[in-house]
Amino acid sequence: MKRTYQPKKRKRKRLHGFLIRMRTRSGRNVIRRRRAKGRKVLTA
């Protein structure tokens, strides 16, 4: 049985990247929360 996490850069960016986050209201909220928390890395 193979492991469940098979990392791919393209898929990671497409699903969790900054531009995708900025497209939806909830995504923008994610960015806002992470900025408020002081996260060094906002998105994948």
UniProtKB/Swiss-Prot annotation:
One GO MF term: structural constituent of ribosome
Entries under InterPro entries matching the protein: Ribosomal_bL34, Ribosomal_bL34_CS
Domain of life where this protein originates: Bacteria
GO biological process terms on file: translation
UniProt name for this protein: Large ribosomal subunit protein bL34
Organism for this UniProt entry: Desulforudis audaxviator (strain MP104C)
PANTHER family, A to Z: LARGE RIBOSOMAL SUBUNIT PROTEIN BL34M, MITOCHONDRIAL RIBOSOMAL PROTEIN 34 FAMILY MEMBER
Keyword Hydrolase among record annotations: no
Pfam families: Ribosomal_L34
Gene3D superfamilies, A to Z: 1.10.287.3980
Record family assignment: Belongs to the bacterial ribosomal protein bL34 family.
Keyword Ribonucleoprotein included in the entry's annotation: yes
GO CC terms: ribonucleoprotein complex; ribosome
Keywords, ordered alphabetically: Ribonucleoprotein, Ribosomal protein
